[in-house]
Amino acid sequence: MKKAFYLLALLAVFTISCTPQKPNPENQTVMKPEKNDDGEWDIDVIDTQYDYFLNAIAKPVSMYTESYLKTRNQFLVSEWNSYYYSGRYRNVIESAIDYDPNENYGLKFEYKLYQVFAYVHWKYGLRMQGLSATDRR
């Protein structure tokens, strides 16, 4: 009888420990755009290959308009955050993005944010539906 009890207790502990854990809202990180010392919005990507991607692979900023990038970024940020909050691609997406579509970030910021999504697709193969076909390489 004792053995059966211990076996059931061990089985219960094992079952409880194997259930998927929901992300704790207190531990979630959110990337929030901030202004730099010059009062302009800026993004800092801490990946050495990102600079290479911007200079050698990404289309130049002159190929885009600010309104085009703003529209794409709204969709891409929504897609990114849905991946983050669902727990998919946790090894790639480590934080949510706090993006306000009513804020005027400027062309440079919108371009760099869009290229972050293109870079993640290029480097990790993450499917981002909001990218244009020419930016999916």
Residue spans for each PLM region:
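Bacterial signal peptide processing site
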Residues: 19-22
